[in-house]
């Protein structure tokens, strides 16, 4: 039975929706007929006016009858024009009312749609979702920190290695400065000494080494002063 009542209800709603459209169609049809009558009466008025002018000097009775018919047509034309104006106003009023009704129906549908959407959402659900997002973001941050700290632990740097590397770098810079000034390292000077007796070689090597060291120290002091 509900389906039957729904069918009848649906037809009733459709009829209510079609009522203004049918009314507008009927009014426009009547307006079209009146506009045709307006043109016909205007032609009749022009025709009777021409007859009256034609017979005004030769046949006054005919001219008078033509003028009488002209007045009758003019009266009918005035009525027709009044009816046309009334119909046009009525059509505009129904069209405006129909637009208002359709606008209201559209707004009702929009309100129902928003009600359906908000019916599935509550402040508690939104807060719960946001809490879950914050928890997951915090968990992700903890995971990243754990991975990063683990990598840093596996790549621990020995301070002794750093000291050795710094000493090597300082030695390289010192060698470069010596090469630029034309004075070779002490070890190279010893290797270039001529062959001699063991005792003499040791004595000369010691003397050369001391002289070279003093010269090197003076050169470094001079460079530092600059």
Curated annotation (Swiss-Prot):
Primary site of residence: cytoplasm
Instruction: Write down the InterPro entries for this protein, in alphabetical order.
Output: Snf7_fam
Task: Give the membrane topology.
Answer: Peripheral membrane protein
Source organism superkingdom: Eukaryota
Keyword terms, alphabetized:
Coiled coil, Cytoplasm, Endosome, Membrane
Subunit structure, as described in the record: A component of the endosomal sorting required for transport complex III (ESCRT-III).
Q: What does this protein do?
A: Required for the sorting and concentration of proteins resulting in the entry of these proteins into the invaginating vesicles of the multivesicular body (MVB). Also required for the proteolytic cleavage of the transcription factor RIM101 in response to alkaline ambient pH.
Instruction: Give the UniProt family note.
Output: Belongs to the SNF7 family.
Protein's name according to its UniProt entry: Vacuolar-sorting protein SNF7
Organismal lineage? Eukaryota, Fungi, Dikarya, Ascomycota, Pezizomycotina
């Amino acid at each position: 039975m509900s389906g039957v009542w729904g069918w009848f209800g649906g037809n009733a709603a459709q009829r209510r929706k079609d009522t203004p459209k049918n009314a507008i169609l009927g009014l426009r049809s009547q307006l079209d007929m009146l506009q045709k009558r307006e043109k016909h009466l205007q032609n009749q008025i022009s025709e009777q006016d021409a007859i009256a002018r034609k017979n005004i000097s030769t046949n006054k009775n005919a001219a008078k009858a033509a003028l009488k018919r002209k007045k009758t047509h003019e009266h009918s034309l005035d009525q027709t024009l009044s009816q046309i104006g009334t119909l046009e106003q009525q059509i505009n009023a129904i069209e405006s009312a129909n637009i208002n009704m359709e606008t209201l129906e559209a707004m009702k549908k929009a309100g129902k749609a928003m009600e359906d959407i908000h019916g599935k959402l509550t402040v508690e659900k939104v807060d719960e979702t946001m809490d879950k997002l914050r928890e997951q973001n915090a968990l992700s941050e903890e995971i990243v920190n754990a991975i990063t700290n683990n990598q840093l632990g596996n790549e621990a740097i020995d301070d002794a290695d750093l000291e050795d590397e710094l000493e090597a770098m300082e030695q390289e810079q010192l060698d470069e400065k010596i090469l630029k000034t034309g004075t070779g390292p002490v070890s190279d000077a010893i290797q270039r000494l001529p062959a001699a007796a063991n005792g003499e070689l040791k004595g000369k090597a010691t003397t050369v080494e001391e002289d070279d060291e003093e010269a090197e120290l003076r050169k470094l002091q001079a460079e530092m002063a600059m």
